[in-house]
Amino acid sequence: MERLIFTAPLAGLISLTFAAFFAKSILKEDAGNKRMKEIAEAIKEGSTAYMKRQYRTIAVVSVIISLLILFLLDEGLKIAAGFLAGAISSAAAGYIGMSISVRANVRTASAASGGAGKALKIAFRGGAVTGLAVIGLALLGTSSLYILYGDADLVVGFGFGASLISLFARAGGGIFTKAADVGADLVGKIEAGIPEDDPRNPAVIADNVGDNVGDCAGMGADLFETYVVTSLAAMLLGSLIIGTYKNAVLYPLMLGSAAIFASIISVFFVKVEKEGKVMSALYRGVGGSTVLSLIAFYYITGFLMGDSRFFYVTVAGVVITVLMVIVTEYYTSKSCRPVKTIAVSSETGAATNIISGLSAGFESTLVPAVVIAAGILVSYFIVGGSADPGTGLYGIAIASVAMLSTAGMIVALDSYGPITDNAGGIAQMANLPAQVRKVTDELDSVGNTTKAVTKGYAIGSTALGALALFADYRNKVSLESQSISLDSPVVLSGILLGAVLPFLFSAVMMSAVGKAAFEVVNEVRRQFREIPGIMEGTAKPEYGRCVDIVTKAALHDMAMPGFLAVIIPLLTGFFLGPEALAGLLTGLIVVGFMLALMMDNGGGAWDNAKKLIEDGYYGGKGSEAHRAAVVGDTVGDPFKDTAGPALNSLIKVVNMVAILFSPLIIGGGFL
């Protein structure tokens, strides 16, 4: 039984091997004509340059924090080493995602000349490289450190490193991509009246670069972090019930191993048998991964735990995933009521479009909240939480681990989106035939849905995983502190501080996008005004200027969100005590979850309302409704691609800070 744990790092290595195999097969595909290669090279150079500058900045911060951990904490050397390993692994996950995306995009565009089948294969397998790399690195790192240290508490540093880099990646990438996107749309579509991805737009390359550094690299680092901290939370809680269930720490690692093999097999399920069935092909892959994982979970549970109730908990986790996907698709799909309502409201102007979009976003929080609440209760009580609260909390953690059984496929779906988006942009800028653009538009339309759906999944898994992390924090501090009571003014003060943190964080992120977009808009206007021949297509815009503007803005403004995530919980714990920090975590998890849902779903609904009008409905392109929808989309962009997704990372970073520094916080506070 002891040797079984080596299955986990082995599974991680196998996942990385298949990621390399798929990457190699993609690179063998044709990259198109000279013009396509030039455009793709510009996107690749911009993406690579930004990532390198971002990682240099993050490296300095990581070294400083690792030194603080080294000198402040017991076993500081091991925890600091784990922190650096987590930071490097998270950065690697993001870089791999970006690297394959900027190579798969042009090959997808080239393959589109032969129809959707081959183009889908290249785009999805490009996404699968990121997905398999993310879960492979996460499981390899977590299990290897546990084997090396023999204590789950010492692996917390790895989770903190992953969380912090994810926050920087989400914040920086989100600011970059949406500043470029908003700037390109406001001047290009509204003022100049030129279509999306038009080579005459000076911000078009920055916009395409942003798809890679924001969506691919950002989501890769985000779900890497989620995978690590959720597995770690289950292991930490499992160590508390090891007297009853001797394999409670090993169990989540084995579930993760089985899910990797299910994901690898399911990649081969994704193929288009008939034209127009792209979404069905993608969901077939996710469904295959889910079914194979559950079959494996059944046998693993019987072998390791000897208690079928834990299998039912994994089923509950998978059901939560399915329901979150369904709800998110409903609120962001062009064929459903919320998006159609926003599109109709656009006919009377931007104001009614904004009002309808906000309404849809607020409404979209109801069902997910009920789903997560039901999942928590079912997972807790089904394993006997009423009799043994420790086992009940472990059940919640296992449900969140089960949610991540589809993480490899979910990351693949998310990364598929920017690959097809870039492919469409390359086809447009290279003036490829209309038939090619039709194929890339079809793939991109599906990609917009998958990006929205995966955000809903990420939020749900964050909420459930954060509860498990909170339970571990509470266990650590309650050993030497009074019980945490909601009628305590100290706890209530902490709840208020935690509740306001997501709003403060979002304000910082939205402000950063607004300032950077302002500079991009002015630069694009300057080029249209001062460079003759751009609109006629006889002069080439200075693409590098816009890339440089958003790069500087992203690197400058990503520091403050990270600072807030680390310093506020530490100050709360040190000055108000561990009970106040517990309240802060409670307020943060609840409000952060709701606000992230509202922003992601509302932003996705605004985006697809615009695309619905561009499909020819409610006036079509160039109409007043279209202009209003573009305004709504530019408001929704930083909602769904900057502030909303970054809230996931904020929630996990703050929880990891609380757990990691809990030995210093115990006994602290002036109240």
Curated annotation (Swiss-Prot):
Main location: membrane
Cofactors demanded by this protein: Mg(2+)
Topological type in the membrane: Multi-pass membrane protein
Binding residue positions for substrate: K178, K640
Key words of the record: Calcium, Cell membrane, Hydrogen ion transport, Ion transport, Magnesium, Membrane, Metal-binding, Translocase, Transmembrane, Transmembrane helix, Transport
GO molecular function terms noted in the UniProt entry: diphosphate hydrolysis-driven proton transmembrane transporter activity; inorganic diphosphate phosphatase activity; magnesium ion binding
Annotated residues for binding of Ca(2+): D607, D633, D637
Top-level taxonomic group: Archaea
Subcellular location: Cell membrane
Residues at the site labelled Important for ion transport: R170, D215, D222, D641, K652
EC annotation from Swiss-Prot or TrEMBL: 7.1.3.1
GO cellular component: plasma membrane
Enzyme class: translocase
Binding site for Mg(2+) 1: D181, D185
Catalytic activity: diphosphate + H2O + H(+)(in) = 2 phosphate + 2 H(+)(out)
Entry binding sites for Mg(2+) 2: N208, D211, D421
Record site: Important for potassium independence: K451
Segments traversing the membrane: 4-24, 57-77, 79-99, 128-148, 156-176, 223-243, 249-269, 285-305, 310-330, 365-385, 393-413, 452-472, 490-510, 558-578, 579-599, 650-670
NCBIfam families in the cross-refs: PRK00733.1-2, PRK00733.2-1, PRK00733.3-4, PRK00733.3-5, V_PPase
Family named by the database record: Belongs to the H(+)-translocating pyrophosphatase (TC 3.A.10) family. K(+)-insensitive subfamily.
Function per UniProt: Proton pump that utilizes the energy of pyrophosphate hydrolysis as the driving force for proton movement across the membrane. Generates a proton motive force.
Subunit structure of this chain's protein: Homodimer.
Protein name: K(+)-insensitive pyrophosphate-energized proton pump
Organism of origin: Methanosarcina mazei (strain ATCC BAA-159 / DSM 3647 / Goe1 / Go1 / JCM 11833 / OCM 88)
Name of the gene this protein is made from: hppA2
